């Protein structure tokens, strides 16, 4: 699997994958997770640019809590193309899926319309609702995201 936006490894430390490639735009983050998982040969980490110089693909492309941080249209477009291009069978996205401005560093997008228009070889499989839907009275205990699963046709 390839995770686009692996972050600091907190979520990864809770999961077990037979093979894992984690990508991020932050050199500091990549350095941290390389050290954190140095003894685990099933995990590899790259800066996105480094990965794209010699890309590979995997059965699953994964995007967790990244999409709504992509406030720039060009970066969003590139991210989505990469997410779907380098996935062989499945893409799983954990994100909001509505067009709505939020703050300077958050932009909710209806990414499903992008997939429908630009990744026609992929079909929507299912949406798994978040067990803790967003509650403005409990913003640190809830989330505005759900899981969206796509399968290659």
Where is each model-derived feature located?
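Class I (Rossmann-like) S-adenosyl-L-methionine-dependent methyltransferase catalytic domain
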Residues: 1-56, 73-153
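Polar, enzyme-active/binding microenvironments
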Residues: 59
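A conserved beta-strand element that flanks and buttresses the S-adenosyl-L-methionine
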Residues: 62
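Short catalytic micro-motifs in class I SAM-dependent methyltransferases
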Residues: 65-69
């Amino acid at each position: 699997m390839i995770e686009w936006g692996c972050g600091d490894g907190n979520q990864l430390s809770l999961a077990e994958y037979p093979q894992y490639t984690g990508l991020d735009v932050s050199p500091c983050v990549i350095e941290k997770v390389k050290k954190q998982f140095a003894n685990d040969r099933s995990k590899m980490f790259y800066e996105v640019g480094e990965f794209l110089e010699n890309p590979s693909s995997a059965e699953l492309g994964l995007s967790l809590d990244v999409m709504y941080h992509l406030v720039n249209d060009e970066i969003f477009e590139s991210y989505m193309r990469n997410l779907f291009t380098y996935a062989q069978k499945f893409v799983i996205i954990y994100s909001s899926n509505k067009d709505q401005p939020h703050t300077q560093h958050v932009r909710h997008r209806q990414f499903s319309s992008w997939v429908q228009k630009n990744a026609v070889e992929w079909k929507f499989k299912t949406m798994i609702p978040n067990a803790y839907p967003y509650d403005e009275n409990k913003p640190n205990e809830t989330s505005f995201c759900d899981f969206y699963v796509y399968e290659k046709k």
